[in-house]
Amino acid sequence: ASLAILKREGQTDVDVSVGELRDEDGFTPDVLQAQILHGFSHGITLYGGMQAAENYGSAALGVGKDLGALGAISFDVTHARANFSHDDTETGQSYRFLYSKRFDDTDTSLRLVGYRYSTEGYYTLNEWASRRNSPEDFWETGNRRSRVEGTLTQSLGRDYGNLYLTLSRQQYWHTDDVERLMQFGYSSSWKRLSWNVSWSYSNTARQGTGNNHASDNTSEQIYMLSLSVPLSGWWGNSYATYSVSQNDNSGS
């Protein structure tokens, strides 16, 4: 989940990184990422960013506003250009709205109520890599059209961790499938050791589109435990993360 994007007045953050995008099938294009945020008066933040690979590029521009007791909002637009072959280049835009609010009386946070709408030609970096490397798998869903997500976090006190609940719904271009996700979890820490336990349930409603495509529902439950352990000595602030999960699948 993401918070509405804000910076204090006069503060500027710049982040630049270079690395490889690691696809599960071994596709590893070099990627450059950069972003900048600056806080202005009256609770306004302007921000922008970019991603670039050999055949992919995107640029984003957005604005955030502190609403005081009402919370905070931000809105941004991303333009992307994705090349798949000499005569197949897609361009499109994505529009995102974020809202966050903290309720001090109950120590509850509404971390995100966001809506993202993408035009048909818009591809994220991961979607571009997936289509280039595994087109048959990619076209089982295609690129994402819209997503709505909300996360509610309840603090149990300084020493007792947090409970959280996330709900989301998303749809894709070129299919009428609807994916829904519910995740409930608990996270806590002790000194530099942290852990998270979660249960998630996802459901995909597939709509039939002709004689060879039957409507069905596929659901999946995932139980996960993750543990983050600090590495002492010369490793400085490095951490080792361990996780274990169990999947239960069903279809109808």
Predicted regions and their residues:
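Conserved, compact domain cores that house catalytic/ligand-binding motifs in diverse enzymes
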Residues: T12-R81
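Flexible, glycine-rich linker and terminal segments associated
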Residues: S2-S17, D66, L70-S252
